[in-house]
Amino acid sequence: VSLYSTGYLTDGNREHPHEGTRRYYAFLLIFIGAMAGLVLSSTILGQLLFFEITGGCSWGLIGYYQSEKSLRSAMKALLITHVASIGLYLAAATLFVSTGTFELTAIATLDEPTKLIVFGGILFAAWGKSAQLPLQAWLPDAMEAPTPVSAYLHAASMVKVGVYIFARAIMSADGDVPHLIGWVGITMAVITLIYGFMMYLPQKDMKRLLAWSTITQLSYIFLALSISIFGPREAFEGGIAYIFNHAFAKSLF
């Protein structure tokens, strides 16, 4: 995507403004670094830090064109994803108060009620970042961003943050996740799937159609991860495999 941008942001592309390329690459490269940091972080505090950085970079990239519509879409994405981050703040605070550490592996030592709070917060944050109901509204509007941004951030990378932190929490719990989280995850994934499919029909803009496609594909991953809470390891492995499948396929668009 970065290499493609070097051709996309040129005078040869008549439909694209030719100013602000330094700003574009700065936000894009910081975002890539933040994604690497989030994936490699072994603490929920580290995840929270990089979670917020990706949100800020997304705001800068969605609003790159500086039009009224793109700036409004950028602010919408920033607000919704930051409201979702409240769940991660809650989970981090609860984990630290209960165990004295931010290490994700400490989740396995929590009692059932505390674990429910931590997983509830993580799941809420994951819904916001991965554009699941009721926090899905920002993603279709985020397609105001330049096409390389839509391909990388909002189809292949940023939207995977939510499913990643949820999957990482499930792994850290050593298979002991409250079943209520599984039922809530399954229910919301199915509702998002149905709603997303219905929203395919009225779309006339291809990028918005792809955004709704991303939302429903992420619902499949949430559905698989939620089912895995009840025992089937194949569901977890299938969900993880589908993260890569969707990222490669959607980036082609």
Predicted regions and their residues:
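Hydrophobic transmembrane alpha-helices and their helix-loop junctions in integral membrane proteins
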Residues: 2-47, 56-253
